[in-house]
Amino acid sequence: MYLPENASRARLRQAENARSNRQEILTAWSQGQISRRDLIKLGLFTAAGTIILKSGLSPFAASADSTIPTGLPASPLFGVQPFTQPMPRLDLLARNAVSTLSPAPTAEANTTQQVLNPALEGVRPGDTGPIEGRPPGPIWAHQAFNQFFPQVAIEVTELGARTNTTYNPGVPSSLNSGINPAAPIPPRFHPSLPDQGPNAVWTYQGTFPPKLAQFRYGESALFRNHNGLPFSITQNGGFGRHTTSTHRHNGHHGAENDGFTGAFFFPGQFYDYHYPLTLAGFRTINPAATDPNAGGPADNGGIIKVPGDWHETMSSHWFHDHMFGFTSQNVYKGLAGMMNLYSAKDRGNEAINDGINLRLPSGTAKAWGNLDYDVNIMLADKAWNSNGQLAFDIFETDGFLGDVMTVNGAFKPFFEVERRKYRFRMLNAAVARFFTISLSDASPMIQIANDGNLLPNPVTLTQLDELGIAERYEIVIDFSRYPIGGKVWMVNLAEHEDGRRVANDLTLSQALSGTSPDPGVGRFLEFRIVRDPATPDQSQVPAVLIPNPDLSQVPVTRTRRFVFGDKGSQTTTDPVTSGRGPWGIGTDGGGQLNADFGRVSAAPKFGTREIWELVNDGGGWDHPIHVHFEESQILARNGSASNVPAWEKGRKDVFRLRPDGSVTITTQFRDFGGMFMEHCHNTTHEDNAMLLRWEIDDSGAPFVRPLPTPIPKPQGVTFQSPDDILPSAF
């Protein structure tokens, strides 16, 4: 997709002009000045939602004086070389008492009125609306709010890029590659690259690096998100939408806290997300909280016992925007962070040896949540324009690929390590790019978790499986094998030709050769071995981590089949709830439908277990499918249990279908009610429009059947009946 550095000036000029032309269209569309239907009428989009193959517009059309496609202009690096800046640890969010929140959190949405800013679309001078954007009333009230009343609060604000003067990596400078936390951090991908403008990048708190929240089981949390983005829809730097909805991927809680794509809120509002932080199955399994394996870490080194099944313990989540039709743009723009969960089994203290704590690499200074040797890594490919400002292109609906690799928001950094074991929590936060990761010397890595769930048993690998968008792999690397002064690199072997799928998984030597036309291939993170540890490494990787829940006594009540493909069509017309694009999902033998968050596609009964078959209907693409709400187990790949590799034998929430492939999963629907989602996490596919709504049926008052659809406006959320209910849903 991207032109090589030695491309002719004429091709570079044509490519830049074409991108500029596309950016004008993108700006008009993202700011609501023109609709997708208008683009089709003007002959700029096909009915399938792809850009017309037209010279001066499409990067894939021949130019006026050449039969060679113009391609995309490479992101300028302004002379910056790889591995010349330290990788920053993620920025730790402050944990405060709930009493510090004003106004205090409430079970139902806070409908206190405020005067609205007339720059908001559809707002007249003097209009008022609620201060909280959560839909009002009992259906969207926090479930189990009093049972799990919040004990800790984390408060964030979505803002445009600005300098970070309060950076908190959670570790001393010596364990953060020498970064001085007191030094201001400008909004740059490298110290020698330009500052990002306030509307080029939007992040939580408006600052670099991305944020990290620490939670523990047994300490319910209130996550208050303020929308501080520009009031005017036009102030977006050319892409992104200022209405947002925050998804905790993949939290087990009520739907009102899930970041439903249609429950978005506006600048000037906040939304309170309540995280019970207890274990799945808490209503029927270990309800008296007597099992010491089921719990969180106490401040004295002990355990806070919680109800639920300890086999459902999770370790790594992330949070990101889920705005309908704009998820790819908003997440790419910076609205994403990570969450670490600590438990009785995984306390973040490697010294506690009580027969329950697994003692994974972390540290020992604090009772729980040590980050010394527990490192978050957020991977994303980016691109920027000739001025160095973040750039995005919606017109390749196969999936946007960047040509610059970033780790924790930094262009190809280095990270200093000691000669001991480290745990790395790796997240693919890209739009469409997959990663296949190896170390440059092919040394072994121990995979301990998949999608935030510790595996039943660790798996030793020299090359990780493809890491799909939104998947999380946790690995342990032992750097004691290297001498002080040594270096080793993380390498990406997955070569893309477009955003549909990985074209080739290269050999390590091929990836290191520098000959791949894909700029995302090769070294992206340098480890520098700088010293021996000051104290002995007390961490371990036990042979048994967290076994899967026993489902043998849980009957299967229903099987459903979902087919994901490029034959999407739309049967509804509501401009707020319905999307359009080439991608769609077929349910139980029906046609592939574009997204409509007002359509009910499935409604499993509360307290039951189902089997879902997820099918990719083509060989030309891959889809990482995310099912919200509760972790699932993979029963089969392509119809056979023997095709499930060891690293997929734990619980998961993202399922790479692979070209022409299928994945059969089983899931329980318990504890909470409401409406949830299932979608492709190639967020370009999701936005164009591979997403469906499902809801939990018969979960008791106040829920009704079917649930009304929320329609957010600055003046308040209203409700309407579903646009459509598929015949096989209930």
Regions from the language model: what does each represent?
Residues 1-38, 47, 60-63:
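N-terminal secretory signal peptides
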Residues 26, 45-50, 54-75, 367:
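Bacterial Sec-dependent N-terminal signal peptides
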Residues 30-33, 52-54, 316:
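Intrinsically disordered, low-complexity segments enriched in small residues
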Residues 36-37, 425-428, 560:
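Short, cationic motifs built from Arg/Lys/His that form the positively charged side of catalytic pockets
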Residues 65-159, 328-380, 455-622, 629, ...:
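Extended terminal and domain-junction accessory segments
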Residues 141-342, 346-351, 433-468, 488-508, ...:
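Histidine- and aromatic-enriched segments that form or immediately flank copper-ligand environments
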Residues 250-279, 379-543, 548, 642:
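Histidine- and aromatic-rich segments of cupredoxin/plastocyanin-like copper-binding domains
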